[in-house]
């Protein structure tokens, strides 16, 4: 019987952490009736012993057959915690009662825990013996130390003081070791491992930490990360709404929370690697993440994977409008594998338990447990459940955008998941063997890289992120909702002026997007068209949805030799919003780019539009018979208009008032033309 129950601790693949988390709930549930015959008892004796000894009845002992023990052991390896249905099925198979099955598994887990605790005690005893020997060596060394000047003992008299100090230090080390061992019971599958000591005994558990974060702080971060992971898993399993969209009474702080689930064209390992690599993460979510960096690696993943990895990160999160401040956050990111093809990545502010001083600063916010759960479903696809929950000062946001940020579309789960789906679809299309452009692979890659730089420059001019060193200008005759920025530029060389404003329009996002992308309607609002309609000379599709592409435009009906200018444009449209960004480029430069040349030397001054839902919860859109207008009671969309112009070719030149008035008039004129074309009253 004992031979069936012994665990070979000398095996190299023995993993005690597998059992530590599984055995927590069994600590007071059951005890073994006997070390030699725990699997031979039905469990009736435990109940009999707890009753008052008024009547003595002969206890029946039931010894399981070898076949029963073999089947129970086999099932235990697969599932140490069978549910009632599994116990009934197993009992029916082995002709045992469900209660007998239950007690057998309880006793089996209890004995496994006892064996594991015994080996933990061996580890601690070895560590204690090692510390004791080191202390003895230091004691002997100090006892024989002599002063260089006087030749006397360094510590006069008895060495009791030195012994006392060593005991204090030993106690501190022992306490720290106990804390790490306790943490190991929770940190299953992380970077804590059994390290083989120099004396050849069983290793002690250690924790690799960053160089800039102290050991105590790292343990605190790990505790916080694991609590956040538990909270994320609970939120993902809830079937009801997670949070109320309203602020607490009497508080200016807002607590938006959202959850969204969808399919993504990427496998779990690739997505986990993207999320845990700061540069890849910022590139994937470029319209949300302005800048990001990893401050410290708190814990590396185990076995060369990202499982158990904890990062201390900081990032700036943006909404495409000058009326919404950039949200700056410092947070922990923890990645954990919960099964084959099942991962979870959680973010949480590292100062979540502190006060709200950070919220008082402009753009300050706090991140509650947020992140995603990723599950492989085959064919290179994953099912992703995204959860977002944060806190910010509502008074810092313009009233026009407060409903949007309170919904899941502003910076909520819908925005993150839709962006992930769009980007993964784009990467999948670009990696496919089908050629829709007639360009070489190098040419396509070069033009897409140029379009990406154009987008990032446009985002920076709208949100004033730190990608470029923008300086804010306060000018007269400029509306309060219009932001004027300036910066020195190297390509093109000179002073660049950026102007952006946002407004609400009573048209649907789809209607406005189609109008702005229609080349035949371009002359109704774009001064670069010179009154002519525009046509595509090149189109690189980036998604299945119509309008998601990078294109080259030129005036229709004109010979290519008549004009040396083309317009590079990128557009996309999904449930989270839409984008139309463009920039004039010269033909020789684009010929070089389309041939696979370096696009970094092409000068760009992007302009364009960002379209966002207005965050209203009204019913379906209402169209009129002539052009897509909706009633004021129905939801419209939020339009952000942004222009960048070169006002002086000398980087050292001073900005004049006329330049500011020019770009301000350009924005006002463009908005007026769009309103007129869509028959929207001013």
UniProtKB/Swiss-Prot annotation:
<keyword id="KW-0804">Transcription</keyword>
<feature type="coiled-coil region">
    <location>
        <begin position="105"/>
        <end position="186"/>
    </location>
</feature>
<feature type="region of interest" description="Disordered">
    <location>
        <begin position="33"/>
        <end position="65"/>
    </location>
</feature>
<dbReference type="Pfam" id="PF00046">
    <property type="entry name" value="Homeodomain"/>
</dbReference>
<dbReference type="GO" id="GO:0008289">
    <property type="term" value="F:lipid binding"/>
</dbReference>
<dbReference type="InterPro" id="IPR023393">
    <property type="entry name" value="START-like_dom_sf"/>
</dbReference>
<dbReference type="InterPro" id="IPR042160">
    <property type="entry name" value="GLABRA2/ANL2/PDF2/ATML1-like"/>
</dbReference>
<dbReference type="InterPro" id="IPR002913">
    <property type="entry name" value="START_lipid-bd_dom"/>
</dbReference>
<keyword id="KW-0805">Transcription regulation</keyword>
<comment type="similarity">
    <text>Belongs to the HD-ZIP homeobox family. Class IV subfamily.</text>
</comment>
<dbReference type="GO" id="GO:0030154">
    <property type="term" value="P:cell differentiation"/>
</dbReference>
<comment type="function">
    <text>Probable transcription factor that binds to the DNA sequence 5'-GCATTAAATGC-3'. Seems to promote cell differentiation.</text>
</comment>
<dbReference type="InterPro" id="IPR009057">
    <property type="entry name" value="Homeodomain-like_sf"/>
</dbReference>
<dbReference type="GO" id="GO:0043565">
    <property type="term" value="F:sequence-specific DNA binding"/>
</dbReference>
<feature type="DNA-binding region" description="Homeobox">
    <location>
        <begin position="57"/>
        <end position="116"/>
    </location>
</feature>
<keyword id="KW-0175">Coiled coil</keyword>
<dbReference type="Pfam" id="PF01852">
    <property type="entry name" value="START"/>
</dbReference>
<feature type="compositionally biased region" description="Basic residues">
    <location>
        <begin position="52"/>
        <end position="65"/>
    </location>
</feature>
<dbReference type="GO" id="GO:0003700">
    <property type="term" value="F:DNA-binding transcription factor activity"/>
</dbReference>
<keyword id="KW-0371">Homeobox</keyword>
<comment type="subunit">
    <text>Interacts with AIL7/PLT7.</text>
</comment>
<keyword id="KW-0539">Nucleus</keyword>
<feature type="domain" description="START">
    <location>
        <begin position="214"/>
        <end position="429"/>
    </location>
</feature>
<keyword id="KW-0238">DNA-binding</keyword>
<dbReference type="GO" id="GO:0005634">
    <property type="term" value="C:nucleus"/>
</dbReference>
<protein>
    <recommendedName>
        <fullName>Homeobox-leucine zipper protein HDG7</fullName>
    </recommendedName>
</protein>
<dbReference type="InterPro" id="IPR001356">
    <property type="entry name" value="HD"/>
</dbReference>
């Amino acid at each position: 019987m004992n031979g069936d129950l012994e665990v070979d601790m000398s095996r190299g693949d023995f993993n005690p952490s597998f059992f530590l988390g599984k055995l927590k709930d069994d600590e007071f549930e059951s005890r073994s009736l006997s070390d030699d015959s725990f699997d031979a008892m039905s469990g009736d004796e435990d109940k009999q012993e707890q009753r008052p000894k008024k009547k003595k009845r002969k206890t029946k002992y039931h010894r399981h057959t070898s076949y029963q023990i073999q089947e129970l052991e086999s099932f235990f390896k697969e599932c140490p915690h069978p549910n009632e249905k599994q116990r009934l099925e197993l009992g029916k198979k082995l002709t045992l009662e469900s209660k007998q099955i239950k007690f057998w598994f309880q006793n089996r887990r209890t004995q496994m825990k006892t064996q594991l605790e015994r080996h933990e005690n061996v580890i601690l005893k070895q560590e204690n013996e090692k510390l004791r020997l080191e202390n003895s060596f230091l004691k002997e060394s100090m006892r024989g130390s002599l002063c260089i000047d006087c030749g006397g003992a360094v510590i006069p008299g008895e060495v009791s003081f030195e012994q006392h100090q060593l005991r204090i230090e030993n106690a501190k080390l022992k306490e720290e070791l106990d804390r790490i061992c306790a943490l190991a019971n929770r940190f299953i599958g992380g970077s804590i491992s059994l390290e083989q000591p120099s004396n050849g005994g069983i290793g002690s558990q250690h924790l690799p930490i960053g160089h800039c974060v102290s050991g105590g702080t790292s343990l605190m971060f790990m505790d916080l990360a694991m609590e956040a992971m538990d909270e994320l898993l609970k939120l993902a399993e809830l079937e009801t709404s997670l949070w109320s969209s309203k602020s607490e009474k009497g508080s200016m702080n807002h607590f938006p929370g959202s959850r969204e689930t969808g399919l993504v064209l990427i496998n779990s390992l690739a997505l986990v690697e993207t999320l845990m690599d700061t540069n890849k993460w910022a590139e994937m979510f470029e319209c949300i993440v302005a800048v990001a960096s990893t401050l410290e690696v708190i814990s590396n993943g185990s076995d060369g994977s990202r499982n158990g990895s904890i990062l201390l990160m900081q990032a700036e999160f943006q909404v495409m409008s000058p009326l919404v401040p950039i949200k700056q956050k410092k947070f922990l990111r923890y990645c954990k594998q919960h099964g084959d093809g099942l991962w979870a990545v959680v973010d949480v502010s590292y100062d979540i338990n502190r006060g709200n001083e950070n919220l008082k600063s402009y753009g300050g916010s706090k991140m509650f447990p947020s992140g995603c759960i990723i599950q492989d479903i085959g064919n290179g696809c994953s099912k992703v459940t995204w959860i977002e929950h944060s806190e910010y000062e509502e008074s810092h946001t313009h009233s026009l955008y407060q409903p949007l940020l309170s919904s899941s579309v502003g910076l909520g789960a819908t925005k993150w998941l839709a962006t992930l789906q769009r980007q993964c679809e784009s990467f999948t299309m670009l990696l496919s063997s089908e050629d829709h452009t007639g360009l070489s692979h190098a040419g396509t890659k070069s033009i897409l890289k140029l379009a990406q730089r154009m987008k990032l420059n446009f985002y920076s001019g709208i949100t004033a992120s730190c990608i470029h060193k923008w300086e804010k200008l306060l000018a007269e005759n400029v509306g309060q909702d219009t932001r004027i920025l300036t910066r020195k530029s190297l390509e093109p060389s000179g002073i660049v002026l950026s102007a952006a404003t946002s407004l609400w329009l009573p048209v649907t996002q789809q209607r406005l997007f189609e109008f702005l992308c229609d080349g035949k309607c371009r002359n109704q609002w774009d001064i670069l068209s010179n009154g002519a309609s525009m046509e595509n000379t090149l189109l690189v599709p980036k998604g299945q949805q119509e309008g998601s592409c990078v294109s080259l435009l030129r005036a229709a009906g004109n010979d290519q030799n008549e004009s040396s200018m083309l317009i590079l444009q990128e557009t996309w449209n999904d449930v989270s919003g839409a984008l139309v960004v463009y920039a004039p480029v010269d033909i020789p430069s684009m010929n070089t780019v389309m041939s696979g040349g370096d696009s970094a030397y092409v000068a760009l001054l992007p302009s364009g539009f960002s379209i966002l839902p207005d965050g209203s919860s009204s019913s379906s859109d209402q169209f009129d018979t002539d052009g897509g207008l909706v009633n004021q009671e129905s939801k419209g969309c939020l339009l952000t208009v942004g222009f960048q112009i070169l006002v002086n070719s000398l980087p050292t030149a001073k900005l004049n008032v006329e330049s500011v008035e020019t770009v301000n008039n350009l924005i006002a004129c463009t908005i007026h033309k769009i309103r007129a074309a869509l028959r929207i009253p001013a």
